[in-house]
Amino acid sequence: MGRRKVEIKRIENKSSRQVTFSKRRKGLIEKARQLSILCESSIAVVAVSGSGKLYDSASGDNMSKIIDRYEIHHADELKALDLAEKIRNYLPHKELLEIVQSKLEESNVDNVSVDSLISMEEQLETALSVIRAKKTELMMEDMKSLQEREKLLIEENQILASQVGKKTFLVIEGDRGMSRENGSGNKVPETLSLLK
């Protein structure tokens, strides 16, 4: 007799749901461990219970190494997607420039109508405004990041200045303490005359 098929749907009873989560989580982690051993691979499992408790397990490598590799790979994918989007955005501009170039070649100058030239001019102005808007956006982002960096540097400078001020104050107070008489009535000896 085989196992009966369980319908996959939300378990209404809270305690049954928690027990099922615990058992299946343990089974998932065990399967991940077995896969790691069998295939000599690094596997990370992260599960969050309905109550918000985090469970994680790593096989093959430690969790931080696996997550670092994932982040590097994910960043590369995002760069590739960003590059593909930029290419898609620039293709119409490239095609437009090719059309303008072909229309303005000497052999085609006689065949270009005024309406066609006006249309090309409007398309070029539209493309130029899009490019200028993107340029402005990028410049604003750069300016914002530079302002944030400036703010951080000013805060760091203030912290360092206050630390230097405290050290200077301690040195000055220390010098004053050295020049005063100590409790027994004897003066603290001054530095050697050779060192002055």
Curated annotation (Swiss-Prot):
Cross-referenced InterPro entries: MADS-box/MEF2_TF (IPR050142), TF_Kbox (IPR002487), TF_MADSbox (IPR002100), TF_MADSbox_sf (IPR036879)
GO BP term (any one): vernalization response
Gene3D superfamilies per record: Transcription factor, MADS-box
GO cellular component, one term: nucleus
Domain MADS-box: 1-61
Keywords on record: DNA-binding, Nucleus, Transcription, Transcription regulation
Expression sites (tissue/organ): Mostly expressed in roots, leaves and flowers, and, to a lower extent, in inflorescence, siliques, pollen and shoots.
Subcellular location: Nucleus
Name this polypeptide is given: Agamous-like MADS-box protein AGL70
Organism of derivation: Arabidopsis thaliana
